[in-house]
């Protein structure tokens, strides 16, 4: 006799599920997922047609600046800044703990499979004890929770964004390319320090000692993309806005240069990744929010509407201040700028104006 699977009755308040179950069942499939020390089985029902709509699409346009770990948007009513999967660290910590524990147990129970240097011998087979299998199941469960959290968080942000507008202006992002390591090996001009026994530090540059030659790191944004899945957010946003009857515009990055332009001087200057603020006239702006503002002031795919920028810039500054005061979820970008605003003003020499 096969396994009996029961379906829970539909709740009266769950309108979405009631509408979905009115459609014709196309086919079913059984899905297995790890939960703590065992697997659980779920029946997934695929219905005919499109899914019911949960939200109401907003009206108006929106400038969206996407990053590998954050998004910033600006529209008629609001300027906001969000971190993708802000609480991902607790899931990463759990995965790390179980990974280390599983590797230790496997090494302890299979010492013959490792050489003198601690490397695995090719062709060796591992025997897992009951405790090792339990640890492995907990590790799989941790990965499942992380995946579910990323998907749930990104879907929530997509829905909140669609409630604000029906036209999104953004930059096309190739997250697959950003995740790859750099191919070229480049030397760095940074100074390395060597510590002596008397704890006195001696500065050594690459010109004074060949041993102290420093090289730039080849890693880029792979770790951040793995943790926060900005590619999933982008693809989900594009598919959902089309399904709800809205649209999106991908600007020409080479000509538009939303992250580089200053609408007052009308000049483009490429900033460093560490520079999170920009000086526009006499005002300091958060770089990502300002990029979203320039995307909002859209003329065509290659040009910014500078006249619209001048008209709306004061309104942008007010919205930025309100965002920094009210939304304490701004990670360390805008909050840090707010706390150190007076210092930044002095550094930029604004007291001279």
Regions found by a protein language model. Give the residues of each.
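Acidic carboxylate diad motif detector
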Residues: 1-36, 222-223, 227
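Positively charged, helix-rich recognition surfaces that bind polyanionic ligands
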Residues: 39-353
């Amino acid at each position: 006799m096969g396994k009996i699977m029961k379906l829970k009755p539909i709740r009266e308040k769950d309108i979405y599920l009631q509408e979905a179950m009115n459609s014709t069942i196309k086919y079913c499939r059984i899905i297995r997922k790890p939960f703590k020390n065992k697997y659980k089985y779920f029946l997934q029902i695929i219905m005919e047609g499109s899914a019911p709509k949960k939200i109401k699409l907003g009206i108006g346009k929106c400038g969206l600046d996407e990053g590998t770990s954050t998004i910033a948007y600006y529209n008629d009513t609001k300027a906001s800044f969000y971190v993708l999967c802000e609480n991902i660290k607790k899931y990463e910590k759990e995965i790390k703990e179980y990974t280390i524990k599983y590797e230790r147990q496997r090494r302890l129970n299979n010492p013959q499979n490792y050489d003198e240097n601690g490397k695995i011998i090719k062709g060796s087979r591992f025997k897992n004890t009951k405790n090792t299998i339990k640890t492995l199941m907990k590790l799989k469960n941790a990965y499942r929770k992380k995946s579910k959290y990323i998907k749930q968080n990104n879907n929530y942000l997509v829905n909140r964004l669609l409630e604000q507008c029906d036209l999104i202006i953004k930059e096309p992002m190739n997250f697959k390319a950003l995740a790859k390591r750099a191919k070229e090996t480049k030397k760095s001009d940074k100074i390395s320090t060597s510590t002596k026994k008397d704890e006195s530090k001696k500065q050594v540059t690459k010109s004074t000692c060949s041993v102290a030659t420093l090289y730039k790191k080849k890693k880029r944004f792979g770790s951040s993309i793995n943790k926060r899945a900005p590619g999933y957010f982008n693809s989900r946003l594009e598919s959902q806005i089309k399904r709800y009857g809205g649209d999106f515009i991908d600007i020409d990055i080479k000509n538009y240069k939303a992250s580089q332009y200053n609408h007052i001087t009308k000049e483009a200057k490429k900033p460093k990744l560490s520079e999170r603020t920009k000086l526009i006239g006499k005002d300091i702006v958060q770089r990502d929010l300002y990029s979203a503002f320039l995307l909002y002031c859209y003329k065509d795919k290659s040009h910014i509407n500078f006249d619209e920028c001048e008209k709306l810039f004061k309104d942008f500054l007010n919205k930025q201040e309100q965002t920094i005061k009210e939304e304490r979820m701004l990670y360390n970008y805008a909050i840090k700028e707010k706390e150190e605003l007076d210092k930044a003003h002095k550094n930029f020499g604004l007291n001279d104006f």
